């Protein structure tokens, strides 16, 4: 996920999924790092590479003592894939309650937003108690809500 401020982009972005192939740490301030993990869903990578990413992500989630939140990015335009569901369930099994970032919100009509969010919730089998934030890198929709949530976590 790329959240930009007026000065810089914290994570490189690409039109092609699967470009992040390592764990990348971005120093935001003295209290906060943003950690970008490899994607899994639409990446054009072979099975061995995806398995390596899975192990890398699992090791990071198990070993990180400072991890406060996991954001799971899912394309709002589609029903959750089996990989999305597996990843959500796996993150929960590791003791985290992921925040769902419903990406590409600018690609659907505003009138379809709630319907698409309901499709995501149904597909993931989650209730309204799970935070889901519609997000667009293009329009910056959801950016402030994400930062507000991060700041709240940093204060706890």
Residue ranges: model-predicted function:
Residues 79-94, 114-120:
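Conserved catalytic-core segment of NTP-binding enzymes
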Residues 40-50, 77, 106-109:
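Flexible beta-alpha connector loops of hexameric P-loop NTPases
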Residues 1-5:
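Conserved small/polar residues in nucleotide/adenosyl-binding loops
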Residues 49-77, 89-101:
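Inter-motif core of Ras-like GTPase G domains
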Residues 36:
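Conserved active-site aspartate in kinases
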Residues 20, 50-54, 64, 81, ...:
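Amphipathic alpha-helical transducer elements in NTP-driven molecular machines
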Residues 108-156:
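Canonical P-loop GTPase G-domain recognition
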Residues 6-30:
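Switch I (effector-binding) loop of TRAFAC-class P-loop GTPase G-domains
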């Amino acid at each position: 996920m790329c959240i930009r401020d007026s000065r810089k982009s914290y994570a490189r972005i690409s039109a092609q999924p699967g470009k992040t192939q390592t764990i990348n740490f971005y120093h935001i301030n003295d209290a906060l790092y943003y950690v970008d993990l490899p994607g899994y869903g639409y990446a054009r990578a072979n099975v061995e590479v995806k398995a390596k990413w899975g192990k890398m992500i699992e090791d990071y989630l198990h070993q990180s003592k400072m991890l406060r939140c996991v954001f799971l990015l899912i394309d709002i335009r589609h029903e959750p894939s089996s990989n999305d569901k597996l990843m959500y369930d796996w993150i929960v099994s590791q003791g985290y309650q992921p925040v769902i970032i419903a990406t590409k919100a600018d690609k659907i009509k505003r009138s379809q937003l709630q319907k698409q969010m309901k499709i995501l919730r149904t597909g993931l089998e989650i209730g309204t108690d799970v935070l889901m934030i519609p997000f667009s890198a293009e329009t910056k929709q959801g950016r402030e809500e994400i930062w507000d949530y991060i700041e709240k976590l940093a204060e706890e």
